[in-house]
């Protein structure tokens, strides 16, 4: 049923687009050209010149005494474009069915073969607890680049479990992950002279085998779960988990490479920790509770 709705939406969008074209610009197609036209379920879309910034603040408040909280604010987010691949390599949104199980909503990233689609991100962060406000500084991501992969969401297979079940596949490069505890400064520069203190992790590469996206969670064979739980003692918390893998091939393998880790400080001096590499990673099970 959902697939039929998506088809109807796509047809409606196509008809609306045709309605804006003058009749004089339409040309008949030969049989050979028509034979090459094929349809697909789902919706394809892309971005062009995307950028946003402003005083938006996201806050997670704990139910514990005093309601301590963690916040992110003053967001900046932008994306560069691969102009030649805007329509040939889009994001894809699809809904598909599984035998005897709930339907899945799947969002697939562009393949980004040329590596031109890159994200820039910055946000301030802090913690409020015990009547004290701590401003942690600014988190900066430079040249965040996705190559394929994507996110799938559905309902948990166990009807007694509430929340969102998900699958996640990633092949991602990050030019620089930077934490500046004193001031944001110029977020487009990795190491400006005016910044006296920062942590910089550069050249982060995460992928699966053969440089393909790493299936950290699979919506059917190794689903992740994100939900809110209240235990028998009345304590509430956010829960993030990934189940055991049910595939006969076991959990997929990934790899992580970091080109350099550097601490910069005008007080204690600079410390260069060099590079790091984990050749093979298998995520068998994950259970994280946020209090």
Residue ranges and their predicted role:
Residues 1-44:
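Low-complexity repetitive segments in secreted/extracellular proteins
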Residues 44-291:
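Intrinsically disordered, low-complexity polar regions and short flexible loop motifs
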């Amino acid at each position: 049923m959902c697939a039929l709705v998506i088809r109807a939406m796509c047809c409606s969008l196509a008809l609306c687009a045709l309605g804006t074209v003058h009749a004089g610009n339409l040309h008949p197609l030969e049989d050979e050209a028509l034979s090459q036209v094929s349809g697909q379920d789902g919706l394809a879309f892309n971005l062009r010149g995307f950028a946003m910034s402003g005083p938006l603040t996201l806050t997670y408040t704990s139910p514990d005494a005093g309601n301590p909280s963690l916040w992110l604010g003053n967001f900046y987010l932008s994306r560069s474009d691969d102009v030649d691949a805007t329509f040939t390599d889009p994001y894809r949104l699809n809904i598909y069915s599984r035998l005897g199980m709930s339907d899945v909503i799947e969002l697939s990233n562009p393949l980004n073969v040329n590596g031109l689609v890159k994200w820039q991100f910055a946000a301030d962060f802090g913690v409020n607890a015990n009547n004290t406000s701590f401003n942690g500084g600014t988190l900066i991501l430079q040249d965040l680049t996705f190559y394929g992969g994507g996110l799938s969401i559905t309902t948990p297979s166990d009807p007694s479990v509430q929340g969102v079940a998900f699958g996640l596949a990633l092949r991602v490069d990050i030019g620089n992950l930077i934490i500046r505890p004193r001031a944001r400064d110029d977020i487009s520069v990795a190491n400006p002279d005016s910044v006296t203190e920062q942590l910089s992790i550069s050249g982060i590469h995460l992928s699966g085998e053969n440089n393909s996206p790493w299936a950290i969670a699979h919506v059917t064979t190794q689903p992740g779960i994100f939900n809110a739980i209240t235990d028998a003692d009345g304590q509430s918390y956010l829960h993030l988990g990934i189940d055991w893998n049910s595939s006969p091939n076991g959990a997929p393998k990934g790899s992580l490479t970091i080109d350099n880790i550097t601490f910069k400080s005008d007080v204690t001096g600079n410390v260069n920790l060099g590079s790091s590499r984990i050749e093979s990673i298998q995520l068998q099970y994950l259970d994280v509770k946020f209090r």
